[in-house]
């Protein structure tokens, strides 16, 4: 089975459960609080490992985040390439309303302190045909894409959170894009974000060698490449917390492809896994194991 390198964010999530998302000028009390492991990179690595893949996590944290390494190890994620020499780990302040919606404030911390020499040292351990999973919560993404491509890695990119500098990245070297309709419209500079077919066609045409996986909330998910277009409706589930839904989706889609499933099956398994995730509280801990999905 292919090795997977997830070079991404590692956050300490500080989660407040509230009646509703705080409004400007408003002060309210939470009815519960907890701290847990998170970050898109961490969540996606956890999803891949829980789906039964051979996954390696790389990134940077401070001593305050060492518990995250222990948790990842408990899910059989290899953590050898996580650097722990930063002062402060990334932080996420997460509000979760009673209807399961969330609002997130990020503080990058160590996530934007990854050096090119650290990246080079890590990439030495991976070779042609291995997967490189990236999100936009760390620095040097353009360097990672270029160096990963040089080594023949299969690059999967989730351009979230979207920033304008993404447009300067060597995106033509990406094999799989995981986007929602807003991110896809931003990449293609499509004005009408409600015209989902146009957005999907625009990003497919902009990157003809890539597979496009686009999620559209309650409209479900789409896969597009060449003349192939597949739609997967959502799977209804009670919504408790949507925090790691997208990360679960990406992890289980990639895991399904690596296991040999076709894109229709991969979309279904990814959607099913996300439905399980949103029915539970938390990020990494809410992601299901493979025996619940496949």
Write out the residue ranges for each language-model feature:
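Ribokinase/PfkB-type carbohydrate-kinase core domain
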Residues: 1-10, 70-84, 96-229
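Substrate-binding N-lobe of the ribokinase-like
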Residues: 3-4, 24-91
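Conserved phosphate-binding/catalytic region of the ribokinase-like
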Residues: 4-5, 164, 195-294
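Short N-terminal binding/cap micro-motifs at the start of the first secondary-structure element
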Residues: 13-17
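Short glycine/proline- and charge-enriched loop/turn segments
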Residues: 21-30, 178-180, 230-233
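Short, conserved phosphate/pyrophosphate- and ester-handling motifs at nucleotide-, phospho-/glycolipid
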Residues: 48, 180, 246
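Gly/Ala-rich phosphate-binding loop of Rossmann-like dinucleotide-binding domains
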Residues: 49-50, 149, 258
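Hydrophobic residues at beta-strand termini and immediately following loops
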Residues: 58, 105, 232-233
